[in-house]
Amino acid sequence: MVKISLDNTALYADIDTTPQFEPSKTTVADILTKDALEFIVLLHRTFNSTRKQLLANRSNLQSKLDSGEYRFDFLPETEQIRNDPTWQGAIPAPGLINRSSEITGPPLRNMLVNALNAEVTTYMTDFEDSSSPTWENMIYGQVNLYDAIRNQIDFKTPRKEYRLKDDISRLPTLIVRPRGWHMVEKHLYIDDEPISASIFDFGLYFYHNAKELVKIGKGPYFYLPKMEHHMEVKLWNDIFCVAQDFIGMPRGTIRATVLIETLPAAFQMEEIIYQIREHSSGLNCGRWDYIFSTIKKLRNLPEHVLPNRDLVTMTSPFMDAYVKRLINTCHRRGVHAMGGMAAQIPIKDDPKANEAAMNKVRNDKIREMKNGHDGSWVAHPALAPICNEVFSNMGTANQIYFVPDVHVTSSDLLNTKIQDAQVTTEGIRVNLDIGLQYMEAWLRGSGCVPINHLMEDAATAEVSRCQLYQWVKHGVVLSDTGDKVTPELTAKILNEETAKLASASPLGEKNKFALAAKYFLPEVTGKIFSDFLTTLLYDEIIKPSAKPVDLSKL
């Protein structure tokens, strides 16, 4: 039996008791209460050993892929689950029946207000890839959500006043994305190890807000990222059951949409829904992370080298297969199949370019709607009307009733052949430019970064990094010059791009491009392949206090 106590628990961060966003009086002390900390410590002590074992399993699988011992296929041990037509996911929960347009963004206070005021049906509040996990971003994200759910998020800055346009019960449904299983929160140690960031984010939000959310006619809803095996989903389901039992909430009140954004998960979609069926609200196509994962898992195999990033689209064979399998699987099991992100942001000073960008969004959403998706993501409120217009053609709140007649094989999911594929010097430069810009902003505490009129998150930088690693490893020949991609070439272009970006930075000497390049260099020259950029850079952005807080005074 796990002991519910704060013994051997150390918090290396100040518990701020000063309100930061008048007129709200909410402070960090209202989030990091003794009861809330005991709750997340209980979850950590109960489930962290399982989490660590599942992460070790990921490493073991990668070793087998690298050696050629394992090739992806559907799991023989779960064939019975796939072949049983009788089981279904949960019926759509209150506030999650119509999900035709979902906006996403980090839990910054101004972004929360803007997203909740947008003409969308749901809002995915993101502690993961569009957030840089500084202590301030993570803990004040909890403060901001606490206030939003209680209609007390309105605030003023010297330049602008932010106000919700209506009662929270009539605004877009909140869905929170915690950090992935691979991340930890190093400001809170339990039994001499950092707490799982997933449990930290989920636990604080759930403990403080679950009952309030039910009161307003919604519920505690989540997006679950980066999972690579159905047993990782089972772990979430076990946590949900314990969490609901702990606060006296009926099981099944929580709902979770799982992002299918890793290659292993694409072979386990049915098992993933099955493991969380009591709490399932569907699956989502996490397109950029899926490309990243495909390269990451198959990086040692020359037949799976992908071309310039702009040539890898949702109509590429392996992407098209994964989308069609996802929609078919979700609708057969009675849950939502959500489309991917439109990352475009308005181009205010160029009407012609803006029109072209918006047409690209419209065509992308039309493709998704026709394929059978029940809704899709946008990164900016200006894109919401386009998404709404397209998905209004469903004629219903969703199209779960429509089960596309498709048969997707394991070979289809691994078909990375792309017509007219090429790698060019410009492709190298684009990857380095985007990767450096994103990493530099992330190191300064911003995880949601406008680059070339697109709102980028960590997945974009991950694609940049792993493509360059793959091109160097396999000595890809450049279409424009006939030269091989070598460590020397990528290092040379990296230095050029770093100097160019640093000299143009409005921050002057305070920019972090040199630091970003230091971490980027061994990755893009093929020397090392880190699991995630976010874990690689994490220690650069945290500032734990030297001494822990005295928790006995809470």
Swiss-Prot record:
One Pfam match: MS_N
SUPFAM superfamilies per UniProt: Malate synthase G
Top EC class, one word: transferase
A biological process from GO: allantoin catabolic process
Entry annotated with the keyword Glycoprotein: no
UniProt induction comment: Expression is insensitive to carbon catabolite repression, but highly sensitive to nitrogen catabolite repression. Its expression is induced by allophanate or oxalurate.
Quaternary state and interactors: Interacts with PEX9.
Database matches in PANTHER family: MALATE SYNTHASE, MALATE SYNTHASE 1-RELATED
Name of protein: Malate synthase 2
Gene: DAL7
